[in-house]
Protein backbone atom coordinates (compact mmCIF):
# COMPACT_ATOMS: atom_id res chain seq x y z
CA UNK A 1 0.00 0.00 0.00
CA UNK A 2 1.43 3.37 -0.96
CA UNK A 3 0.93 6.65 0.82
CA UNK A 4 0.43 10.11 -0.61
CA UNK A 5 3.05 12.58 0.61
CA UNK A 6 1.69 15.46 2.65
CA UNK A 7 4.04 18.02 1.13
CA UNK A 8 5.37 18.18 -2.36
CA UNK A 9 8.53 19.84 -3.53
CA UNK A 10 7.99 22.36 -6.34
CA UNK A 11 9.69 20.13 -8.92
CA UNK A 12 7.36 17.26 -8.02
CA UNK A 13 4.12 19.23 -8.16
CA UNK A 14 1.31 18.32 -10.48
CA UNK A 15 1.11 20.40 -13.64
CA UNK A 16 -2.30 21.54 -12.37
CA UNK A 17 -0.84 23.03 -9.18
CA UNK A 18 -0.40 26.40 -10.89
CA UNK A 19 -4.14 26.61 -11.55
CA UNK A 20 -5.64 24.79 -8.58
CA UNK A 21 -3.32 26.00 -5.79
CA UNK A 22 -1.22 28.89 -7.13
CA UNK A 23 1.50 30.43 -4.99
CA UNK A 24 1.32 33.67 -6.98
CA UNK A 25 -1.35 35.29 -9.14
CA UNK A 26 -1.15 38.10 -11.69
CA UNK A 27 -4.42 39.91 -12.33
CA UNK A 28 -4.29 41.26 -15.87
CA UNK A 29 -6.79 44.07 -16.16
CA UNK A 30 -6.81 44.81 -12.43
CA UNK A 31 -8.94 47.85 -11.72
CA UNK A 32 -9.75 50.30 -8.95
CA UNK A 33 -13.33 50.48 -10.29
CA UNK A 34 -15.61 48.30 -8.11
CA UNK A 35 -17.83 47.53 -11.12
CA UNK A 36 -14.99 45.88 -13.07
CA UNK A 37 -14.11 42.19 -13.09
CA UNK A 38 -10.45 42.97 -12.33
CA UNK A 39 -11.44 44.71 -9.10
CA UNK A 40 -13.80 41.92 -8.07
CA UNK A 41 -11.08 39.32 -8.66
CA UNK A 42 -8.69 41.18 -6.36
CA UNK A 43 -11.29 41.71 -3.65
CA UNK A 44 -12.29 38.06 -3.82
CA UNK A 45 -8.71 36.86 -3.34
CA UNK A 46 -8.14 39.23 -0.42
CA UNK A 47 -11.47 38.51 1.30
CA UNK A 48 -11.01 34.77 0.88
CA UNK A 49 -7.65 34.98 2.65
CA UNK A 50 -5.38 34.15 -0.29
CA UNK A 51 -1.87 34.08 1.16
CA UNK A 52 0.24 34.07 -1.98
CA UNK A 53 1.61 37.00 -3.93
CA UNK A 54 -0.89 39.11 -5.89
CA UNK A 55 0.44 41.11 -8.83
CA UNK A 56 -2.15 43.54 -10.24
CA UNK A 57 -1.36 44.51 -13.83
CA UNK A 58 -2.56 48.00 -14.75
CA UNK A 59 -0.38 50.60 -16.50
CA UNK A 60 -2.62 53.53 -15.52
CA UNK A 61 -2.90 53.12 -11.73
CA UNK A 62 0.01 53.04 -9.24
CA UNK A 63 -1.81 50.86 -6.66
CA UNK A 64 -5.10 49.05 -6.21
CA UNK A 65 -6.43 48.14 -2.77
CA UNK A 66 -3.05 49.07 -1.34
CA UNK A 67 -1.12 46.71 -3.64
CA UNK A 68 1.42 48.24 -6.02
CA UNK A 69 0.52 47.61 -9.66
CA UNK A 70 2.84 46.57 -12.44
CA UNK A 71 2.57 48.15 -15.90
CA UNK A 72 2.54 44.90 -17.86
CA UNK A 73 3.30 41.19 -17.74
CA UNK A 74 6.94 41.82 -18.66
CA UNK A 75 7.39 43.47 -15.24
CA UNK A 76 6.39 40.31 -13.36
CA UNK A 77 9.00 38.46 -11.34
CA UNK A 78 9.90 35.00 -12.61
CA UNK A 79 7.84 32.04 -11.51
CA UNK A 80 4.31 33.44 -11.32
CA UNK A 81 1.90 30.52 -11.30
CA UNK A 82 -1.38 31.93 -12.57
CA UNK A 83 -2.79 34.86 -14.51
CA UNK A 84 -6.40 35.89 -14.11
CA UNK A 85 -7.19 37.59 -17.42
CA UNK A 86 -9.87 40.22 -16.84
CA UNK A 87 -9.74 42.02 -20.18
CA UNK A 88 -11.92 42.10 -23.30
CA UNK A 89 -11.77 39.02 -25.52
CA UNK A 90 -9.93 40.81 -28.34
CA UNK A 91 -6.86 41.30 -26.10
CA UNK A 92 -6.73 37.75 -24.74
CA UNK A 93 -4.61 35.96 -27.41
CA UNK A 94 -1.80 38.52 -27.04
CA UNK A 95 -2.01 38.35 -23.24
CA UNK A 96 -1.78 34.55 -23.28
CA UNK A 97 1.26 34.80 -25.59
CA UNK A 98 2.86 37.25 -23.12
CA UNK A 99 2.12 34.85 -20.27
CA UNK A 100 4.02 32.15 -22.14
CA UNK A 101 6.94 34.48 -22.82
CA UNK A 102 7.11 35.40 -19.13
CA UNK A 103 6.83 31.80 -17.90
CA UNK A 104 3.39 32.11 -16.31
CA UNK A 105 2.25 28.50 -15.93
CA UNK A 106 -1.53 28.85 -16.09
CA UNK A 107 -4.29 31.29 -16.97
CA UNK A 108 -7.97 31.65 -16.23
CA UNK A 109 -9.81 33.80 -18.76
CA UNK A 110 -12.58 35.82 -17.12
CA UNK A 111 -14.10 37.18 -20.31
CA UNK A 112 -16.85 36.41 -22.78
CA UNK A 113 -16.87 36.91 -26.51
CA UNK A 114 -15.29 33.69 -27.70
CA UNK A 115 -16.82 30.70 -29.50
CA UNK A 116 -20.21 31.34 -27.89
CA UNK A 117 -20.48 34.65 -29.75
CA UNK A 118 -19.96 33.44 -33.31
CA UNK A 119 -17.24 33.10 -35.93
CA UNK A 120 -15.14 36.09 -34.83
CA UNK A 121 -15.18 34.88 -31.23
CA UNK A 122 -14.30 31.35 -32.34
CA UNK A 123 -11.26 32.75 -34.16
CA UNK A 124 -10.17 34.59 -30.99
CA UNK A 125 -10.57 31.39 -28.98
CA UNK A 126 -8.47 29.44 -31.48
CA UNK A 127 -5.78 32.15 -31.32
CA UNK A 128 -5.77 32.05 -27.51
CA UNK A 129 -5.49 28.25 -27.52
CA UNK A 130 -2.64 28.36 -30.04
CA UNK A 131 -0.81 30.96 -27.92
CA UNK A 132 -1.29 28.80 -24.83
CA UNK A 133 0.06 25.70 -26.55
CA UNK A 134 3.02 27.59 -28.01
CA UNK A 135 3.90 29.13 -24.64
CA UNK A 136 3.19 26.15 -22.39
CA UNK A 137 0.36 27.93 -20.56
CA UNK A 138 -2.45 25.80 -19.15
CA UNK A 139 -5.90 27.29 -19.58
Region annotations inferred by a language model:
Residues 1-138:
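Catalytic-core regions of core metabolic enzymes
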Amino acid sequence: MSTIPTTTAPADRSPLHAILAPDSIAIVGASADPTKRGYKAMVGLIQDGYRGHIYPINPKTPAILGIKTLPDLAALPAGVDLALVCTPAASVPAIIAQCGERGVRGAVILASGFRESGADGAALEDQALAAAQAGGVRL
